[in-house]
C-alpha cells in the first residue's frame, strides 16, 4: 500500500509513501529552534500526559525533549518532538496556563 489514513487525535492525517525524502533543517523560534518540516497537534493535558507515559513505557526516544514555551504567560505550553517509524517529525503540545 502506498498510502494510509490515520486518526490523528480526531483529524484525518493521510500519509503517502515516497522514495524522496525532504531534508530536515531547524528554524529559530522563541525558545531555541525546531525541526522543519514537522506535523503538530495540541492535546488536552490528560491526553498529553498519557501519551508521554506511553512513550516512556515503550522506550521511545524524544527527538526534542519536553520543554516549556512562553513560560509565565497565558500561552505557556509544554511541547516535545518525536519521529514516527517513517522518520516524520511530530510536535506534541499542551497548554499549561489556561488549558481551555
Spans of features found by a protein language model:
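Core segments of cupin and vicinal oxygen chelate
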Residues: 1-20
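Conserved beta-strand edge residues that scaffold enzyme active sites
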Residues: 1-3, 69-70, 96
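Short connector loops at helix/strand junctions that flank enzyme active sites
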Residues: 8-10, 31-36
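A short acidic/small-residue loop/turn micro-motif
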Residues: 21, 96-99
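Short beta-strand/turn micro-motifs at beta-sheet edges
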Residues: 24-29
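Vicinal oxygen chelate
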Residues: 34, 39-85
Amino acid at each position: 500500500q502506498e498510502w494510509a489514513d490515520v486518526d490523528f487525535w480526531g483529524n484525518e492525517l493521510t500519509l503517502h509513501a515516497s522514495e524522496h525524502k525532504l531534508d530536515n533543517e531547524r528554524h529559530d523560534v522563541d525558545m531555541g529552534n525546531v525541526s522543519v518540516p514537522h506535523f503538530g497537534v495540541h492535546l488536552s493535558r490528560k491526553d498529553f500526559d498519557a501519551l508521554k507515559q506511553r512513550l516512556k513505557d515503550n522506550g521511545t526516544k524524544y527527538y526534542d525533549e519536553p520543554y516549556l514555551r512562553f513560560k509565565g504567560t497565558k500561552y505557556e505550553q509544554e511541547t516535545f518532538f518525536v519521529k514516527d517509524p517513517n522518520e516524520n517529525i511530530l510536535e506534541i503540545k499542551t497548554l499549561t496556563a489556561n488549558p481551555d
